[in-house]
């Protein structure tokens, strides 16, 4: 009897399924683009890899080890081999969070381990959880799907403004423009930047060891290293604005995010790109930038301005710059089309341009539009505290009621561009989420405050002469509010101080909204989103009725 029982037990063991595998502990966080959290130079900041190797080993503490082993990612087989090896290596080339199991098999059955999580990060954000927007201030849901509604988000907004990506009402936007991506270059190539204390020096730190005319990140801490909501874990490879944008895009798959290259103080290098070699370096670096930072959907060129009259008065050659602008856009478009074939992703090429008639005249925009998906018409900054005698509307649709000959208007710019042959649907009209103004305004006649002269710039929110819409709205009781029905322009005036501020109000933005629909334009965009309390973006998204719909 004992011999019989022993035989039965032996047969049961001999024909039992393999023992349950237990996966050994390991750090299973990987990154296809690795970021050096201590680096300040872009050359040392990132390393792009085609794939990562994920090793796995296991033990069986009770029972047989099996004949064959399989490694499963999310229940899909990714490796097969001899079970006796008790180890495997899996090559991974896409991002995600994977439940990994080991499955052991023999002729009598199989056993499966408990899952462990393998996290492979990439800059498409596939490893992250969606970052949802929590509705705040006056923002309310609603976005038209037949037009562009865009806004600029600035890299430095995470500091004094306290405005990270999670505060941006992204469900209400079709496009977010990230300001700004710089172009490397030192003395003589980025002199305009020296007007901002510490900014030129910061760029030199970021561009250390990197060739002139390559793009970089101006502030790596703000962009990719600063812990923020949703990307604050110690082992999260992509923190900062970029990390949040990756996660926010998962929650808003409709959103297009474009890096805006240039801007007021970062446009100097463009003036040197008539040199084909310098231009080639730039275009290739933009391609590399998009390959590294996969959450971006193209590129925005913000050259202020071809022909000059920008931040650096020493630069500008109208005829040469006009040619440079066209060939630069052509080469960027060709590069993006080539990249699109490699990635199967659609890339947009856009450009922010001046709405001043004198600057529009420099460029053949009928030719430029062939390469552009959108033209962001900066229909603001017409007037400001750089002059204490030439007071006027800093943003307006039409000429003021008191100056019918004014040519610095949105309507005049649109007519000039469409007159050149630019397709109306490519034109995106600008909204100013800030005001420009003066203090000590006096000598005006009656209530014609712009007929006076000023003592200087009005005290500003972040710089004198410039006041955020949020602040204007919060302090509205201190002012007389007026809306020029002829110009479709808003302003406020404080008689005691002589503070006069021209700005976009809900009234003027609704007027721009109607204008866009009446003229078949592409939509609206705003500078800059952190200055709004939701009022202006709501007005940009408002479904307005025009006369032919009544």
UniProtKB/Swiss-Prot annotation:
Signal peptide limits: 1-16
GO function term, MF aspect, one: endochitinase activity
Annotated transmembrane regions: none
Main EC class the enzyme belongs to: hydrolase
Record: active site: 304
PANTHER family per the UniProt record, alphabetical: CHITINASE, CHITINASE 12-RELATED
Identification of the protein by name: Probable endochitinase
């Amino acid at each position: 009897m004992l011999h019989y029982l022993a035989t039965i037990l032996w047969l049961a063991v001999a024909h039992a399924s393999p023992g349950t595998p237990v996966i050994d502990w390991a750090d299973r966080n990987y990154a296809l683009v690795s970021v050096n959290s201590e680096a300040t130079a872009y050359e040392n900041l990132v390393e792009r890899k085609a794939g990562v190797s994920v090793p796995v080993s296991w033990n069986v503490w009770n029972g047989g080890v099996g004949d064959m082993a399989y490694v499963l990612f999310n229940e899909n087989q990714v490796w097969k081999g001899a079970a006796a090896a008790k180890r495997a290596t899996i090559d991974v080339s896409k991002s995600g969070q994977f439940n990994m199991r080991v499955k052991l098999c023999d002729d009598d059955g199989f056993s499966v381990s408990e899952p462990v999580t393998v996290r492979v990060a990439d800059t498409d954000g596939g490893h992250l959880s969606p970052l949802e927007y929590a509705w705040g201030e006056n923002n309310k849901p609603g976005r038209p799907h037949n037009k562009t509604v865009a806004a600029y988000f600035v890299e430095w907004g995470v500091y004094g403004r306290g405005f990270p990506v999670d505060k941006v009402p992204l469900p209400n936007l079709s496009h977010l423009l990230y300001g700004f991506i710089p172009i490397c270059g030192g003395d003589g190539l980025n002199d305009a930047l020296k007007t901002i204390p510490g900014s030129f020096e910061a760029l030199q730190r970021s561009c250390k060891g990197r060739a002139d005319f390559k793009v970089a990140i101006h502030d790596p801490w703000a962009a990719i290293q600063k812990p923020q909501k949703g990307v604050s874990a110690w082992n999260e490879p992509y923190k900062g604005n970029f990390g949040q944008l990756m996660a926010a895009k998962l929650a808003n798959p409709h959103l297009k995010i474009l890096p805006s290259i240039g801007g007021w103080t970062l446009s100097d290098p463009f003036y040197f790109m008539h040199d084909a070699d310098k231009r080639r370096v730039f275009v290739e670096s933009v391609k590399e930038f998009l390959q590294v930072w996969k959450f971006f959907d193209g590129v925005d060129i913000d050259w202020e301005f071809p022909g000059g009259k920008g931040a650096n008065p020493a630069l500008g050659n109208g005829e040469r710059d006009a040619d440079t602008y066209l060939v630069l856009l052509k080469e960027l478009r060709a590069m993006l089309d080539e990249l699109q074939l490699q990635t199967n992703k659609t890339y947009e090429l856009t450009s922010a341009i001046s709405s001043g008639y004198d600057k529009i005249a420099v460029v053949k925009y009928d030719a430029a539009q062939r390469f552009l998906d959108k033209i962001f018409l900066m229909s603001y900054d017409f007037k400001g505290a750089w002059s204490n005698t030439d007071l006027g509307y800093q943003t307006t649709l039409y000429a003021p009621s008191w100056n019918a000959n004014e040519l610095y208007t949105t309507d005049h710019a649109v007519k000039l561009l469409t007159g050149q042959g630019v397709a109306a649907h490519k034109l995106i009209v600008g909204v100013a989420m800030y005001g420009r103004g003066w203090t000590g305004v006096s000598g005006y006649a009656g209530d014609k405050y712009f007929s006076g002269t000023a003592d200087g710039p009005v005290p500003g929110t972040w710089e004198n002469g410039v006041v955020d819409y949020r602040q204007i709205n919060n302090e509205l009781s201190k002012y007389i509010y007026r809306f020029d029905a002829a110009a479709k322009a808003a302003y406020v005036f404080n008689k005691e101080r002589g503070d006069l501020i021209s700005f976009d109000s809900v009234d003027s933005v609704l007027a721009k909204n109607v204008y866009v629909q009446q003229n078949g334009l592409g939509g609206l965009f705003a500078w800059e989103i952190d200055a709004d309390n939701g009022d202006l973006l709501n007005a940009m998204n408002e479904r307005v009725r025009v006369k032919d719909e009544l």
